[in-house]
Amino acid sequence: MIKAIVTDIEGTTSDIRFVHSVLFPYARERLADTVRQHGSDPEIAQALDALRQELSQPDADSETLIAALNQFMDEDRKSTALKLLQGIIWRAGYRNGDFQGHLYPEVAAQLAAWQQQGLRLYVYSSGSVEAQQLLFGYSNAGDLRPLFSDYFDTRVGAKRETDSYRTIAQAIGLPAEQLLFLSDIRQELDAAQEAGWHTCQLIRDDADSVSRHRQVARFDQIDLPEYAQ
């Protein structure tokens, strides 16, 4: 019997194009000015110090850091410092009303229904916990943060590594057979399944004929009693 559901974001609750066409360009346009004009602000200074450590350049100046950040974005590198700075910029954008977090139309109602049924809800995404909370807190369906019990990012491990799901199960405090992971990526679901989890693949766009996981097109097509069999 499923007692908790852990969901991915990109391609699962939300259109991946929102991240790549809205969030990433918004941060890129403002990153250099943020470093130059606000580099002494405590939160930003901490992120820049983390970047210097990543680069092994403790004395790197602002322009060197900006060049590195632009390179990281070009390479889609999973840099902790870059994620911190992007999160700071996105926070301002959400609060200013420059954009709202995108959710597919059925997601909010289904999440609320599951919570009302007594299920615990969690998020596991490659985006930082703060970025996750911003997306759900300023979503096009309102503030959904009260629906979630907790959030996980890659600090627990990469999403294609089986041990990451063991770590999350331990943090949640439930056995793997009572957990359901939702994602659009087959390899992530493979890792969760290897850890003993139930899985469901969201097919929002292109079909995945290789996958062996249960597949649905929408959250409201997920039939939880099937997982009790």
Swiss-Prot record:
Sorted keywords for this record are: Amino-acid biosynthesis, Hydrolase, Magnesium, Metal-binding, Methionine biosynthesis
Function (record text)? Bifunctional enzyme that catalyzes the enolization of 2,3-diketo-5-methylthiopentyl-1-phosphate (DK-MTP-1-P) into the intermediate 2-hydroxy-3-keto-5-methylthiopentenyl-1-phosphate (HK-MTPenyl-1-P), which is then dephosphorylated to form the acireductone 1,2-dihydroxy-3-keto-5-methylthiopentene (DHK-MTPene).
Q: Which InterPro entries match?
A: Enolase-ppase_E1, HAD-like_sf, HAD-SF_hydro_IA, HAD_sf
Report what the protein is called. Enolase-phosphatase E1
Keyword Cytoplasm set for record? no
Report the PANTHER family cross-referenced here. ENOLASE-PHOSPHATASE E1
Which Gene Ontology molecular function entries are recorded, alphabetically? 2,3-diketo-5-methylthiopentyl-1-phosphate enolase activity; 2-hydroxy-3-keto-5-methylthiopentenyl-1-phosphate phosphatase activity; acireductone synthase activity; magnesium ion binding
Q: Which GO terms describe its biological process?
A: L-methionine salvage from methylthioadenosine
Could you tell me what the cofactor note in this record states?
Answer: Binds 1 Mg(2+) ion per subunit.
Q: In which pathway does it act?
A: Amino-acid biosynthesis; L-methionine biosynthesis via salvage pathway; L-methionine from S-methyl-5-thio-alpha-D-ribose 1-phosphate: step 3/6; Amino-acid biosynthesis; L-methionine biosynthesis via salvage pathway; L-methionine from S-methyl-5-thio-alpha-D-ribose 1-phosphate: step 4/6
Using the UniProt record, name the top-level EC class of this enzyme in a single word: hydrolase
Q: Which branch of life, at top level?
A: Bacteria
SUPFAM superfamilies in the record: HAD-like
